[in-house]
Amino acid sequence: MKKYWHIALMLFCVFMITSCGDDDEALEVDEVWKVQNEEAFQAQMLVPGFEQLSSQSNAGFILYKVLKTGESKEPIYYTSKVECYYKGTFIDGTVFDDKSFEAGAPAELTVSEMVDGFATALQNMHPGDRWEIWIPQQMGYGSAGRSASGSVIIKPY
């Protein structure tokens, strides 16, 4: 009888593990939002002062504008850990992430753990630089809308 109890417990555990699996709910793709973002990125390409910077992953390019050049010429590598201030906004100005100077302490980031567009910018900056960057969806959170940890960060498209 004791043997059957263990078998029943093992089967229960198997079902529990299976039921705790990842519930990837299908996130609805917003085609209108996608088109609006692509149009805003294209329009930003025409704004004086912005330049294109290709990613090393060949996923595309970001747009950047140098607001301030820092004193240091020390390079930032893909494996670097950096402290930086930033503010992530949607094209309508809504803030989705704020680690700006006004918000308090800088974020401590590992470049390799950032979305491709952010990593591309950081690897071309130097300590003390201040840039405005525009990241296209394929180099940001893309159609998943998720961060590396899997949490939904932005509206996917």
Where is each model-derived feature located?
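C-terminal motif of bacterial Sec signal peptides marking the signal peptidase cleavage site
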Residues: 15-19
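Sec-dependent signal peptide hydrophobic core
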Residues: 5-13
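Cross-family detector of peptidyl-prolyl cis-trans isomerase
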Residues: 4-5, 20-157
